[in-house]
Design a protein with these regions (language model features):
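Catalytic Walker B motif of ABC-type/P-loop ATPase nucleotide-binding domains
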Residues: 165-169, 384-388
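ABC-family nucleotide-binding domains
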Residues: 175, 387, 394
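The feature captures the beta-strand-to-loop junction immediately N-terminal to the Walker
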Residues: 37-39, 273-275
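Conserved ABC ATPase signature
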Residues: 140-144, 148, 358-362, 366
């Protein structure tokens, strides 16, 4: 059996803060798969970069140890040669989108292999069909949802057919059906002789994966969060009811939302669930006042009608982080900051040790926690909206997130998050289920999760490990 990947006591430290990867060794042969786990910020993404040769070729820092791809030492082999052997899908797929259309994104990698136009066309058509991207082939990648971008990044890499796939959180932005489909596709690749490395927090999706090895990276262990600090975040409770009537959004000639009507209550944590591309992000942007729409949107509070004043945490935190340190990011343009509130946010979100670190150097999960802290530091009047807040979070930090959202709701605020993590959604007070034609159902998770017909209508699978939670 041929060894495709091996690493011998590989370490790496970034120059800005010295964080990175502790000594790690591994070996992967043809037909095998490797799961890499560990808490947020332990170095999974750094290891993925080391295994593909992006470290040391593209990232500065101190590396020791050696990595071999198909017998070639990565620090002595040009990156363009290594890219023929291994493909990497980033944790943030938007960071690897280069082309003006979905189809051209796939074509770009194939042209760099020097394939004939006939072979390129065959692979493009096959890949678009396999990843259910045919209807999006002429769309700009930048207009896709996060899940659709993740599918496109996977499609573009697999179309090149490298012997080794290295995937950084490949399931994080996918709906449950798409996640199971991807696991099946990766499983077939290993049975056909390929190899796969999967860095993930959602290991439960891989429980039946054939020939799967597992390593768990050590990292800087999280400090015990000071949950009593949640009290600082609460405000005087008022009755808040957000009413939406006949909301519609059109963008680029496409109807995204069509005559949607619903309400949201303060005092509840509401989870929005639906397939990739159904309109979850667009809906949150409308509620935050960032997306033009037609229809009526108002908040009933303090016995009067008000315009919604809601903070929002984007699915891609890079879009709202730009300061040189976490401290400066959270306190940005606040004239007289409430330092007690600031310190509580650091404790609750486990960010104290990163206070002087540039936010964009953090892991994806850590960046999301910083983005949430920046929003909550500004005390949004009516509540907070979070787009896929659990991406990149381990179980401990998901617990902290839920504890915080529950405290905000207990203060009477509107708290809404979108998610593909059904296990997380099951712990909300209310589910809002979205389909292509609008809102399919709304109610307590314990009721909706037991109604198979609704989920079949949505085209979503309920993972078997979620049912016991109900």
């Amino acid at each position: 059996m041929t060894t495709l990947l091996s690493a011998e006591r590989v370490t790496f430290a970034y120059p800005q803060d010295g964080r990175g990867l502790q000594p790690t060794s591994l070996q992967l042969d043809e037909g095998q798969a490797l799961f890499i786990g560990g808490e947020s910020g332990c170095g999974k993404s750094t290891l993925a970069r080391c295994l593909t040769g992006m470290i040391p070729h593209l990232y500065h820092g101190k590396m020791s140890g050696r990595v071999w791809l198909a017998g070639q030492c990565t620090d002595q082999t040009p990156l363009w040669k290594l890219s023929d052997l291994a493909g990497l899908v980033f944790q943030n797929p938007a960071a690897q989108m280069l082309s003006p259309t979905v189809e051209e994104e796939i074509i770009f990698g194939l042209e760099n292999l020097g394939l004939s136009p006939t072979e390129i066309r065959r692979r493009v058509d096959d890949t678009l069909a396999r990843f259910d991207l045919e209807r999006l082939s002429l769309r700009s990648p930048q207009t896709l949802s996060g899940g659709e971008q993740q599918k496109l990044a996977l499609a573009a890499i697999t179309a090149r057919n490298p012997a080794l796939l290295i995937l950084d959180e490949p399931l994080s932005m996918l709906d449950t059906s798409a996640a199971f489909d991807l696991v099946a596709l990766l499983s077939r690749r290993t049975t056909e002789g390929g190899a796969v490395v999967i860095c993930e927090h959602r290991q439960e999706y891989l429980k039946d994966f054939p020939n799967l090895q597992t390593i768990v990276l050590d990292g800087a262990h999280s400090e015990l969060a000071n949950e009593s600090g949640v009290d600082w975040l609460t405000q005087e409770s008022t009755e808040i009811r957000l009413e939406a009537e006949n909301l519609s959004v059109e963008r680029g000639g496409h109807t995204i939302l069509n005559d949607w009507s619903f309400h949201l209550l303060g005092g509840q944590v509401t989870a929005i669930v639906g397939r990739n591309g159904v309109g979850k992000t667009t809906l949150l942007r409308v509620l935050a006042g960032l997306q033009p729409y037609s229809g009526e949107l108002a908040v009933h509070a303090n016995n009067r009608l008000e315009r919604p004043q809601l903070g929002i945490v984007f699915q891609n935190p890079d879009l709202q982080l730009f300061n040189p340190s976490v401290r400066e990011e959270i306190l940005y343009h606040i004239d007289q900051p409430d330092i007690a509130r600031y310190n509580s946010l650091l404790a609750i979100l486990d960010l104290k040790r990163y206070e002087q670190v540039p936010p964009l150097l953090l892991s994806e999960g850590e960046k999301r926690r910083v983005a949430l802290a920046t929003v909550l530091m500004r005390c949004p009047q009516h509540g907070v909206l979070l787009d896929e807040p659990a991406l990149g979070l381990d179980a401990f930090h998901k617990y902290l997130l839920l504890r915080l959202l529950e405290a905000l709701a207990a203060a009477g605020q509107v708290v809404v998050f979108s998610t593909h993590d059904i296990e997380l959604a099951a712990q909300a007070n209310r589910l809002l289920l979205l389909g292509p034609q609008g809102i399919v159902a709304s109610g307590p998770p314990q009721q909706l999760l037991m109604q198979d017909s609704i989920w079949e209508h949505l085209g979503l699978r309920i993972p078997d490990w979620v049912r016991p939670l109900c």
